[in-house]
Amino acid sequence: MEDDMWCVSSSGSSRSYRSETAAKYQSGPYQDLEEFEEVDDDIAVEYPCPFCASDYDLVELCHHIDEEHRHEANNGICPVCSKRVKMHMVDHITSHHRDVLKSEQKEMSYREDPYLSDKYLQPHLDELPPSMNHHQHPSKHVSDQFLSFINNSALPNQTKLVLPDSSVEDKNPIKDSSAAKEGTSSCPLSDSDKLEKAKKCEFVQGLLSSAMFDDECDSSE
């Protein structure tokens, strides 16, 4: 009988202990600890430098190798695939592990990193054989086809020729002749022409004055 009472009391105490423990984890510092563990899960993976004992995430590792081990980086073991490469380590990572770099770009927000830009990656992708160059985006090919379609569709508009208007051609000789007349009339006179013109004016003035003088004489008589 006493054993049964002890079992009942022990089971009740264990249930109460579990409920109290669960309440502690649902509130207070234990809840903060769980949030901290969730944050730790989102931290980017660090890779060991193949030339020293330092650990970096993949983007920082590319910077580190390019700045600190530039001359010795042509032969080493890749920290991502654990294979020995016989090319520059940064070139190998940017060409063969581009997906990992892109994922770290989203997690760590390396938006302006030169090692993640197409300007840096494209030369390395062009050097690879077609069987290995599987990182090219199909969207670029589609955009090129769209641009070529636009350029080809604009060609018929460019082939239209503007025919000259016959009425405009008919008016041009008239304008040219009138312009020629104006040019001849506006030419400056020579000295001999000016002298002859002055003599004619004096002769006309003399005739007018003599005619006026004769009229006055007749009226006086």
Swiss-Prot record:
Keyword Cytoplasm appears in the UniProt entry: yes
Post-translational modification as stated in the protein's UniProt record: Not phosphorylated in vitro by CPK3 or CPK11.
Tissue expression notes: Expressed in seedlings, roots, leaves, stems, flowers and siliques.
Swiss-Prot/TrEMBL induction comment: By high-salt stress, but not by abscisic acid.
This protein's GO CC annotations: cytoplasm; nucleus
Main location: cytoplasm
Region feature Disordered, mapped onto this chain: 1-24, 162-193
Entry superkingdom: Eukaryota
Family the UniProt entry places it in: Belongs to the Di19 family.
Protein name from the UniProt record: Protein DEHYDRATION-INDUCED 19 homolog 2
Organism: Arabidopsis thaliana
